[in-house]
């Protein structure tokens, strides 16, 4: 496998590319998503807009684009007081049954094993 990792992708055959992609999905950072899909585990996704998503991953690709189910979106809002100062932080959330998440907004993915 090490010989495929070091070789430029333009020099690999289609079979070698498929083997390399399978290896990267099972051993690299994308293995977190692969295990979550296989075991139907929930994941906690931290997004660039500072929102968190707690969801089950149905599908994903190498760009971290994801199809999610049973999504709980969580964020914090700070209400302004009458004088214009930031007030107390309020935690908010909402439920979304199905969602497509574009991968460029993903910062961190943590798998939460089933109990």
Swiss-Prot record:
GO terms for cellular component: catalytic step 2 spliceosome; cytosol; nucleus; pICln-Sm protein complex; post-mRNA release spliceosomal complex; precatalytic spliceosome; Prp19 complex; spliceosomal complex. Keywords: Cytoplasm, mRNA processing, mRNA splicing, Nucleus, Ribonucleoprotein. Its main location: nucleus. Coiled coil: none annotated. Residues 30-115 form the Sm domain. CDD domains: Sm_D2 (cd01720). One of its GO terms (biological process) is mRNA cis splicing, via spliceosome. Belongs to the snRNP core protein family. Belongs to the 40S cdc5-associated complex (or cwf complex), a spliceosome sub-complex reminiscent of a late-stage spliceosome composed of the U2, U5 and U6 snRNAs and at least brr2, cdc5, cwf2/prp3, cwf3/syf1, cwf4/syf3, cwf5/ecm2, spp42/cwf6, cwf7/spf27, cwf8, cwf9, cwf10, cwf11, cwf12, prp45/cwf13, cwf14, cwf15, cwf16, cwf17, cwf18, cwf19, cwf20, cwf21, cwf22, cwf23, cwf24, cwf25, cwf26, cyp7/cwf27, cwf28, cwf29/ist3, lea1, msl1, prp5/cwf1, prp10, prp12/sap130, prp17, prp22, sap61, sap62, sap114, sap145, slu7, smb1, smd1, smd3, smf1, smg1 and syf2. This is Small nuclear ribonucleoprotein Sm D2. It comes from Schizosaccharomyces pombe (strain 972 / ATCC 24843). The lineage of its organism: Eukaryota, Fungi, Dikarya, Ascomycota, Taphrinomycotina.
